[in-house]
């Protein structure tokens, strides 16, 4: 319990945000069900004609879903979980501020729910317009409680926004410029700026409403020289950016999902970034399009009509960039991809109807009609991020897969700093592909470390662990459960453990050039346990496997390794083939002979496909899909199996 109350770990706090959002979603859904039951048939149904109660339920539903479900989930939950991982930061810039920004939300939700039970409840709608929210219409304490709830929620969001902005600007990995940030990080960054600029205006508006109700001021009371339209201007100066606060994190999520399941980088990265910034800036300049029906003068309506239509330009850039990302890609129609495609379709419809409503004269005619509600609902992004996880493996399978990945493309390093102290690193380098980046981010979120993209040497993504606590907590226990099976990694691990437990610099310089000297004497390491070897082999193929469609029409799979004859022999036996090639070539760096298993028969390659499809998690999976699609015989043989998956 103490861990969760006092935690300053970004992932713990992200988990708390997500749990809180699910709890709030259940409350909000319960209110929604009551509304739908009442509207299910003409006339009075369940609320006995109590219109105030109906308005209270509407208000509570809106506040709960906006301030306690969508914002905590998308910004607090996914933001805390993914932003530090994506920029290579160990945590957020202000961990304790992160903690308090979450723990302000439960009392805020309690205050909001309490407002529904004080006297007749707050039946003002989520806009809380005066004079309906004034003393004459709501004389009890319900609206005051709702205002205090919004204050707490707003403070929470502003603290979180400051934290995100500082983290993104100051805690990126060396070499990660702003133009290399993942799009989801940009989305959270833009959202944080919008929160920081818009929430103080809302706070001022509802504070003036509070003083009108309790301290005899008349900011919004015409009898004292006030104007209720002032409240509408202040509220919608917050309210329209709030729409983008809800949708922009969804933009970032959809960009990653579309990229990952298309097997391509996002089309027009810079255009996507500047489109998000443009949407954020323009969002502050169009607030009065929510107020066409209150009697604005014609010049004001003309300006807001033009400004609102301009927002369609950056929005269109984003939609066409998503479509261009899909075009020509190797599409995998998974659950998150279906959500993303549904979002693009609905968002396009919502955006087009929004352009029509931007026209002030049409908006007045269509005001309070279902057309307007449909516009907003169609712009809502869906729950694809909840379903998007590159790995469908159990933790036991993932452990073996990660060790296989390290055996293939990883290295355990012991280095010195200025001949004084020893440094310890785990490094895994893969090709610079979006799905490899996503896969390594997920692995890093479980086992620790940082992931970053490097542009030199043709580009690659790299997962590094260099923190002794992380080694002690996750990496070394992983190797004790799942032994590496290549002689290279076996000797690296032995060398690593000698100095990890006793960092003797003099002994290090004495032994560092001889750690591979006994490689010939290493006994066969492959694990005979079929389940472990099968899962380990998935990670090893992700690193070292090769799928080739030959110009003659045939298809083959091959995997090679320096020195480890017995390991390659075990792979050959696992796939039930008899052919093992001993190449005359020697490894460029190691100088050891190269052993290779090559499988070209239809039955053998089909066996490999059946084994690899559930296990591969990165770019090799895309290669395998293309490999199958280019071969008619493989496509025919594996069709039923792939459909089942």
Swiss-Prot record:
Processing and modification events after translation: The mature protein may arise from proteolytic cleavage of an in-frame translation of COX1 exons 1 to 8 plus intron 8, containing the aI8 open reading frame.
Localisation per UniProt entry: Mitochondrion; Membrane
Keyword DNA-binding: no
Biological processes annotated in GO: aerobic respiration; intron homing; respiratory electron transport chain
InterPro entries cross-referenced by the UniProt entry: Cyt_c_oxase-like_su1_dom, Cyt_c_oxase-like_su1_sf, Cyt_C_Oxase_1, Cyt_c_Oxase_su1_BS, Cyt_c_oxase_su1_dom, Homing_endonucl, LAGLIDADG_dom
Transmembrane residue ranges: 15-35, 56-76, 99-119, 145-165, 183-203, 234-254, 266-286, 304-324, 337-357
Enzyme Commission identifier(s): 3.1.-.-
Keywords of this entry: Endonuclease, Hydrolase, Intron homing, Membrane, Mitochondrion, Nuclease, Transmembrane, Transmembrane helix
Main enzyme class: hydrolase
Region of interest (COX1 exons 1 to 8 encoded), ranges: 1-368
Location (main, coarse): mitochondrion
GO cellular component, one term: mitochondrion
A Pfam short name: LAGLIDADG_1
One term of GO molecular function: cytochrome-c oxidase activity
Keyword Hydrolase attached: yes
Mode of membrane association: Multi-pass membrane protein
Region named COX1 intron 8 encoded: 369-645
Function: Mitochondrial DNA endonuclease involved in intron homing.
Annotated family: In the C-terminal section; belongs to the LAGLIDADG endonuclease family.
Protein name in the entry: Probable intron-encoded endonuclease aI8
């Amino acid at each position: 319990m103490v861990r969760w109350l006092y935690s300053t770990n970004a992932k713990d706090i992200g988990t708390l945000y997500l749990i809180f959002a699910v709890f709030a979603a259940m409350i909000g859904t319960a209110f929604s069900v009551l509304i739908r039951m009442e509207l299910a048939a003409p006339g009075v149904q369940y609320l006995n004609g109590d219109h105030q109660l109906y308005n209270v339920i509407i208000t509570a539903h809106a506040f709960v879903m906006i301030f306690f479900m969508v914002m905590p989930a998308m910004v607090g939950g996914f933001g805390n979980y993914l932003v530090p991982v994506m920029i290579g930061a160990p945590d957020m810039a202000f961990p304790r501020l992160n903690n308090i920004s979450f723990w302000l939300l439960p009392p805020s939700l309690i205050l909001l729910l309490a407002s529904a039970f004080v006297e007749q409840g707050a039946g003002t709608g989520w806009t809380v317009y005066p004079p309906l929210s004034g003393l004459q219409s709501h004389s009890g304490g319900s609206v005051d409680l709702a205002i205090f709830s919004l204050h707490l929620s707003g403070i929470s969001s502003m603290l979180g926004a400051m934290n995100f902005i500082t983290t993104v600007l100051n805690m990126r990995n060396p070499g990660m410029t702003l133009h290399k940030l993942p799009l989801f990080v940009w989305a959270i960054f833009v959202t944080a700026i919008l929160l920081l600029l818009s929430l103080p205006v809302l706070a001022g508006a509802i504070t003036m409403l509070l003083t009108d109700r309790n301290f005899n001021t008349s900011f919004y009371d015409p009898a004292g020289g006030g104007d209720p339209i002032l409240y509408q201007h202040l509220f919608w100066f917050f309210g329209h950016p709030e729409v983008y606060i809800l949708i922009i994190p969804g933009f970032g999520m959809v960009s990653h999902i579309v990229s990952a399941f298309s097997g391509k980088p996002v089309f027009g990265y810079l255009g996507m970034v500047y489109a998000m910034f443009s949407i954020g800036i323009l969002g502050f300049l169009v607030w009065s399009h929510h107020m066409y029906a209150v009697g604005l003068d014609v010049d004001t309506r003309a300006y807001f009509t033009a400004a609102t239509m301009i927002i369609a330009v950056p929005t269109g850039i984003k939609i066409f960039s998503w479509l261009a990302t899909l075009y020509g890609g190797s599409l995998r129609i998974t659950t998150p991809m279906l959500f993303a495609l549904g979002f693009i379709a609905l968002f396009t419809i919502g955006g087009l109807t929004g352009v029509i409503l931007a026209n002030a004269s049409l908006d007045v005619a269509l005001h309070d009609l279902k057309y307007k509600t449909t516009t907003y609902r169609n712009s809502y992004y869906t729950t694809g991020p909840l379903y998007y996880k590159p790995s469908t493996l159990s933790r036991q399978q993932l452990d073996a897969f990660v060790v296989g990945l390290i055996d293939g493309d990883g290295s355990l390093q012991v280095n010195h700093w200025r001949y004084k102290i020893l440094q310890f690193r785990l490094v895994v380098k893969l090709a610079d592909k979006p799905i490899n980046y996503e896969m390594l981010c997920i692995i890093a979120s479980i086992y620790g470390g940082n992931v970053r993209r490097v542009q030199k040497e043709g580009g690659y993504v790299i997962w590094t662990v260099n923190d002794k606590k992380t080694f002690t907590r996750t990496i070394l226990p992983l190797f004790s459960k799942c032994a590496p099976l290549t002689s290279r990694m076996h000797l690296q691990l032995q060398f690593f453990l000698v100095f990890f437990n006793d960092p003797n610099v003099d002994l290090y310089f004495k032994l560092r050039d001889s750690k591979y000297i006994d490689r010939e004497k290493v006994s066969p390491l492959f694990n005979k346990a079929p389940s472990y070897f099968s899962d380990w082999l998935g990670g090893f193929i992700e690193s070292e496997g090769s799928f080739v469609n030959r110009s003659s029409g045939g298809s083959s799979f091959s995997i090679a390794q320096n020195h480890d004859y017995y390991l390659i022999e075990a792979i050959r036996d696992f796939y039930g083939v008899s052919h093992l090639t001993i190449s005359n070539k020697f490894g460029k760096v190691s100088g050891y002979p190269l052993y290779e298993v090559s499988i070209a028969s239809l039955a053998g390659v089909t066996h490999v496909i059946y084994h690899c499809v559930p296990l591969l998690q990165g770019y090799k999976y895309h290669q395998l899909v293309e490999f199958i699609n280019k071969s008619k015989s493989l496509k025919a043989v594996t069709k039923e199996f792939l459909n089942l998956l």
